[in-house]
A protein has these predicted regions:
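Start-of-domain signal
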Residues: 1-13, 122
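Short consensus segments that form the blades of beta-propeller domains
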Residues: 5-10, 101-106, 144-148
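A short beta-strand signature
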Residues: 10-24
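Residue-level detector of short, conserved catalytic/binding motifs and their immediate flanks
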Residues: 12-16, 112, 156
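Extracytoplasmic/secreted envelope proteins and their assembly/folding machinery
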Residues: 15, 51, 55-58, 130, ...
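Residue-level recognition of well-ordered beta-strand positions that form the cores
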Residues: 17-21, 113-115, 172
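A beta-strand/beta-hairpin structural motif
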Residues: 22-108, 112, 126
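Extracellular calcium-associated, cysteine-rich motifs in secreted modular proteins
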Residues: 118-178
Length: 178
């Protein structure tokens, strides 16, 4: 497939528009939306990123097959981009710690509708290993001690020297293009 059609993983970046609503009793309330495409780094580079339920849902979709750079910082995407909705239980959303001032109550389920224009495979530390492959225990959480091979307090996906030997990982790996 075309690289523009990349299907993002939990460790990647996406360019999208979205609408987020929380479900409170029998009605929904808008808490966030954008009509202009924005870029989300799913894991973030600190305690951030997007909620697990959102990146899990987005990872089932592909971006457009192509786009045109308008030269002014905007893009026109082919009309075959991913369109979807994700219904997120509170345990995969904000659970009991809703963002202050968001209007989201603790334990509210969420609904996101979105248009996924582009998925971008990330290598956050530039070591030649895609970030999703640096999740050593396979649990889709990159900030854990289990994902810090050399125990230096920096998770592998942000550590350009994963094994702590003083030699950058990019200089140690061998890529087979077979």
């Amino acid at each position: 497939g075309n690289e523009n059609e990349y299907q993002p993983t939990f460790a990647d970046r996406a360019i999208l528009t979205y609408r987020g609503e929380n479900i409170d009793s029998l009605s929904t309330h808008l808490f966030d939306e954008t009509t202009v495409p924005v870029s989300f780094d799913f894991p973030g580079t600190g305690n951030g990123g997007v909620i697990p339920g959102f990146h899990e849902g987005l990872s089932e979709f592909r971006g457009a097959s192509g786009y045109t750079d308008n030269g002014d910082g905007t893009y026109n995407y082919n009309d075959d981009y991913g369109i979807g909705a994700v219904f997120i239980p509170s345990g995969l959303g904000y659970f009991s710690t809703s963002p202050s001032g968001s209007g989201i109550n603790p334990y509210d389920p969420l609904i996101f509708t979105f248009q996924l224009y582009r998925g971008i495979q990330m290598d956050h530390d530039g070591d030649g290993i895609p970030s999703y492959l640096e999740d050593l225990d396979g649990d889709k959480i990159l900030f854990e001690q289990d994902d810090d091979f050399d125990g230096d307090g920096v998770p592998n996906y942000l550590d350009p020297d994963d094994d702590g030997d003083g030699v950058p990982t990019a200089d140690e790996i061998e890529v087979n293009d077979a």
